[in-house]
């Protein structure tokens, strides 16, 4: 009777979009959307402190602390997630190595945590202005978050703040590998993510391609 539905949930201190169909017991043709919103306190105000003495508090799925806006137009809606302390354009976190070897294969990859993303969304990448290529959706821990977490385990002196929670698998993570034919020098990695509402977001990061230093 009501084909346009939306559920809102929270208090999990992570963020995800769930879609329920007939296999889940949902009896309508259009899948039911549940938006589980991230929190303003993030990971319970854990983590290192920023320049204002406020914990970074990235959530354990890699989503930054923040808040959401929902705009309704009739029976349609659009959700925007705003990372606290970041410009509204900051919709993803890109993880990649700073430098990769020239002319050789590497097991390193490019990871994109698209905060409002969900399985089935299109996330693409290109390097140095080449052709756009589709990234692979994965459900795994976010390496950006793991890098923050490992700082607490490898420091020689205890840092102010509190160690973040252990990571959980993110439901909005994508991965791609590096081609072997990149030239020496610095390259721009561009990421283009299209959300469930048809909007596109673009962010960039750089990577250097170098020859390994010769052993003395």
Spans of features found by a protein language model:
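Conserved beta-sheet core of the metallophosphoesterase superfamily
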Residues: 1-98
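Long, low-complexity serine/threonine/glycine- and acidic-rich segments characteristic of extracellular
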Residues: 90-216
């Amino acid at each position: 009777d009501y084909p346009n539905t939306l559920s809102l949930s929270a208090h999990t201190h992570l963020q995800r979009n769930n879609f329920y169909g007939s296999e889940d017991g949902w009896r309508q043709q259009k899948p039911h959307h549940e938006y589980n919103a991230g929190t303003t306190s993030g990971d319970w105000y854990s983590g290192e402190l920023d320049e204002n003495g406020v914990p970074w508090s990235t959530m354990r799925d890699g989503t930054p602390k923040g808040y959401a806006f929902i705009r309704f137009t009739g029976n349609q809606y659009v959700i925007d997630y705003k990372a606290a302390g970041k410009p509204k354009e900051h919709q993803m976190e890109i993880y990649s190595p700073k430098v990769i070897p020239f002319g050789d294969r590497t097991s390193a990859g490019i990871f994109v945590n698209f905060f409002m993303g969900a399985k089935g969304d299109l996330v693409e990448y290109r390097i140095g202005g080449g052709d756009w290529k589709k990234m692979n959706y994965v459900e795994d821990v976010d390496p950006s978050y793991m890098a923050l977490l490992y700082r607490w385990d490898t420091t020689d002196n205890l840092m102010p703040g509190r160690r973040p929670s252990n990571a959980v698998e993110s439901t909005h993570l994508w991965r791609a590998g590096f081609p072997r034919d990149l030239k020496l020098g610095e390259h721009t990695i561009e990421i283009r993510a299209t959300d469930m509402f048809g909007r596109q977001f673009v962010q960039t990061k750089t990577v250097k391609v170098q020859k390994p230093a010769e052993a003395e």
